[in-house]
A protein has these predicted regions:
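Short, solvent-exposed loop/turn segments at secondary-structure boundaries
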Residues: 43-46, 162-163
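Short, hinge-like loop/turn segments at secondary-structure boundaries
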Residues: 49-52, 167
């Protein structure tokens, strides 16, 4: 079994893991990102909205598909409430695959290491370091690190392993991308109401080239 040593190990190579690796590797630390999937940015994880401040921080404007000025909120009684100002940028719609890959690539270029097809299997916290076992492409590795960061999302291995609590409420969501929807340019739409999305809302988000992302979240 191979043994590796790093200053920081980050579980999850999404935007948060990628950004953390960029900042830490930029300080001269030896950083490893561990990603369970074979491809960064897949499977698709969210609706792909990124605020201007977050985009400015990572500077990957080439991943932007649409600019959005605001939201048209449809109430259950038929009311329509616009939130935002025409011509004033409120958020970006990005290609999540390209966005994730670009942010993670920044970490790699800063000196971080990236392991895909890799999952942590065991961990032990010792006084001087964290001892981690990782299965990578079927091969087991021992890793010593001074710091372990969990950036592994809603089903976090890190949270479960360290018994950091459980979500108070579970929700279920579905999203698809469609062609032919006639929406208002530079505005997304939100629909609330128990008949449409009990406990949360549905959305329509322009995603470029005449397409829209239509999805719903509701209580499980």
């Amino acid at each position: 079994m191979e043994t590796h040593q790093f200053d920081v190990v980050i579980i999850g190579a999404g935007p948060i893991g990628g950004r953390a690796s960029t900042l830490l590797a930029g300080e001269g630390l030896q950083v490893l990102m561990i990603e369970e999937h074979s491809e960064i940015g897949r499977p698709f994880q969210c609706a792909g909205l990124v605020t201007p401040s977050a985009m400015n921080a990572v500077g990957v404007h080439e991943t932007v598909l649409e600019e959005v000025d605001g939201a048209l909120i449809h109430g259950p009684s038929g009311t329509l409430v616009p939130v935002g100002t025409e011509g004033t940028l409120r958020t970006y719609v990005v290609c999540r695959k390209r966005f994730d890959q670009a942010v993670v690539q920044q970490g790699v270029e800063a000196g971080a290491h990236l392991w895909v097809n890799s999952v942590p299997t065991e961990v032990e916290v010792l006084p001087s370091h964290v001892q981690l076992k990782v299965k990578r492409n079927g091969t087991h590795h021992d890793i010593k690190a001074k710091l372990l960061i969990g950036a592994d999302g809603a089903h976090s291995w890190t949270r479960r392993t360290f018994k950091m609590g459980h979500p108070k409420e579970l929700m279920i969501g579905f999203q698809t991308e469609v062609v032919g929807y006639q929406g208002r340019s530079r505005w997304l739409e939100m629909y609330s109401g128990s008949e449409i999305a009990p406990g949360f809302f549905a959305w329509v988000i322009p995603s470029g080239f005449g397409t829209h992302r239509i999805g719903v979240w509701s209580t499980a």
